[in-house]
Amino acid sequence: MLFGDVWSRENKLSLRDRSMITISALMAQGLYPQVKAHLIIGKEHVLTKEEIVEIATQLAFYCGWPKAWSVFPLVDEVYNTDNKI
């Protein structure tokens, strides 16, 4: 249902925007394995490394610096390799 129904409604919200929202929600909860998976998906949806770093920096003030700092190594790992889901 999630990927078949919700993610397919691109006329309501783009895949890129859905990726940003999902990464933000997962980061706020500290769900780092899922963050990494969605960083890979976000990269495929044309999110840049700079945008992800800015999202993490913004969220650091709302969900805590430790959560943001835990995401930065994942961003480097995903954006410095050719990961695919």
Label the model's feature ranges.
Residues 1-15, 40, 44, 67-85:
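Acidic, glycine/proline-rich low-complexity segments that act as flexible tails and inter-domain linkers
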Residues 14, 48-51:
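Helix N-cap / loop-to-helix initiation motif
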Residues 28-29, 46, 60:
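Generic helix-packing signal
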Residues 10-11, 25-28:
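Short, surface-exposed loop/turn motifs that are enriched in glycine and acidic residues
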Residues 17-26, 55-59:
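Short, structured motif recognition centered on aromatic/hydrophobic residues
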Residues 33-49:
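Mid-chain, well-packed structural core segment of small domains
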Residues 58-60, 65-69:
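Substrate/cofactor-recognition hotspot
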Residues 29-36, 69:
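Short helix-capping/linker segments at secondary-structure and domain boundaries
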